[in-house]
Amino acid sequence: MRHRQSNRKLNRTTSHRLAMFRNMTNSLLKHEVIKTTLPKAKDLRRFVEPLITLGKESTVANQRLAFDRLRDREMVVKLFGELGPRYQARPGGYLRILKYGFRKGDNAPMALVELVDRPESDAAPVDAE
């Protein structure tokens, strides 16, 4: 029975899935917008939003927790130095998921994942596949 099991497996082992979401989170925090499949985007929200909430209070313990999840010192610095203060007044809902059509090869539904209130730029979204 699958009672109380709320996350998707996405045809990956646990370690592969966690590594994939860690890499996607680092890409999202670095570029502030990524393109991925819709199911991955919906599951990524559960991984990223608690990290941004963690970044709103800059304590040593929170920085260590963030480093444990991200494994990238530059992204931890950006999380606590730039993103945490940016979303200080927002009580959640830091990501926006926009449907982006279908992938040409296998017709998979695609989505843009972007940080809300990000500075506007003309850069194209980064593929996170």
From Swiss-Prot:
InterPro entries: Ribosomal_bL17, Ribosomal_bL17_CS, Ribosomal_bL17_sf. It comes from the Bacteria. GO terms for biological process: translation. GO terms for molecular function: structural constituent of ribosome. PROSITE patterns: RIBOSOMAL_L17. Part of the 50S ribosomal subunit. Contacts protein L32. This is Large ribosomal subunit protein bL17.
